[in-house]
Design a protein with these regions (language model features):
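Conserved small/polar residues in nucleotide/adenosyl-binding loops
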Residues: 274-280
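An extracytoplasmic/periplasmic, membrane-proximal ligand-sensing/linker region
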Residues: 121-125, 162, 187-188, 210-272
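Structural signature of the Rossmann-like NAD(P)-dependent dehydrogenase/reductase core
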Residues: 13, 38, 105, 167-172
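C-terminal lobe and pocket-closing loops
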Residues: 85, 157-226, 254-257
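N-terminal (or domain-start) structured segment
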Residues: 1-60, 100, 112, 124-153, ...
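Hinge/capping helix and adjacent helix->loop/strand transition within the periplasmic-binding protein
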Residues: 28-34, 41, 49-137, 186, ...
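Hydrophobic/aromatic residues within well-ordered alpha-helical segments
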Residues: 1, 112-115, 252-255
């Protein structure tokens, strides 16, 4: 994008609070296109649903969508000793044994926790959530058999799946993945509501002129066609998008509504950032 725009783009990492600190600062930046931020499912959907009392920005009202940079697949996988060998048998086994099996995710009220709860809602099954501090420990325990089921981003689980230490049941991805022959996506398996990959994209503060937004989007599209960028994304298990501001705004709103629905219907208790200093007014 720097080459296409003819000026450098400086990355300033503002970590903490699941991305809330950086997002809050970006939302209050000047509306001139010179301060942008990265949108993720966490910052735009999960945080507002899970942390409604102290989130200092509104993901729908405070930002202008520019474009979705890339999508990454999610996966539900099992320990190889799990009695079912395919997705249909997997769901049948869970329905026959409510509460017997446990699933791991990268943490309470994270994207993958909500994916697991959404799975339970869609399939009418009852599995027990075991939260971990990151995907690494969850993957390790799924491989070791401490938990039977894992909801994860595909790139972090793929090495263990390819090694035969985990068995993929289904993926959240628009099409089949060659390296996972015979593994359906959730839409093919009959649950399109679960067929949601994670994404990350570009945002500007709300009120940024559309000619500026479109210029940024055009530069992103050119960058996403660069073979080096495509390879870098592929190496991390992602695929480029580059959709329009309107299309990306629709994706954000759909994911926002999904997270709100899951948290409400599954009675997931809000978590708090009270130990962190967040800028200005809370999200309402």
């Amino acid at each position: 994008m720097s080459q296409e725009l003819g000026q450098p783009m400086v990355v300033e990492n503002k970590g903490g609070a699941g991305g809330a600190i950086g997002a809050a600062e970006a939302a209050r930046a000047d509306k001139d296109g010179y301060t942008l931020s990265i949108a993720t499912v966490s910052t735009m959907a999960v945080n507002p649903a899970c942390r409604p009392n102290d989130l200092p920005y509104d993901p729908i009202k405070d930002f202008q969508a520019v474009t979705n940079f890339a999508n990454t697949a999610n996966v539900v996988a099992v320990n190889p000793k799990f009695p079912a060998k395919d997705f249909k048998g997997f769901v049948e086994e869970l329905k026959k044994n409510p509460g017997k099996y446990s699933y791991g995710s990268s943490g309470t009220c994270g994207v993958l926790h909500l994916m697991g709860e959404s799975f339970k809602m869609a399939t009418g099954t009852d599995i027990v959530h075991v939260p971990y501090k990151g995907s690494g420990p969850a993957v390790a325990d799924a491989v070791g058999g401490q938990i039977e089921i894992l909801f994860d981003n595909l790139p972090s689980s793929m090495p263990q799946i390819q090694a035969g230490k985990l068995r993929a049941m289904a993926i959240a991805w628009p099409e089949d993945i060659a390296a996972l022959k015979g593994v359906p996506n959730f839409k093919e398996a009959g649950f399109p509501v679960l067929n949601q990959p994670v994404w990350y994209g570009l945002l500007a503060p709300k009120g940024t002129p559309m000619e500026v937004v479109n210029k940024l989007r055009d530069a992103a599209v050119v960058a996403l066609k660069d073979p080096k960028v495509i390879k870098a994304l592929d190496d991390q298990g992602s695929a480029p998008s580059g959709n329009t501001p309107e299309e990306f705004a629709k994706e954000i709103k759909e994911q926002f509504d999904w997270a709100q629905d899951v948290v409400k219907k599954q009675n997931i208790k809000p978590v708090s950032y009270t130990h962190l200093t967040l800028p200005t007014t809370p999200y309402v």
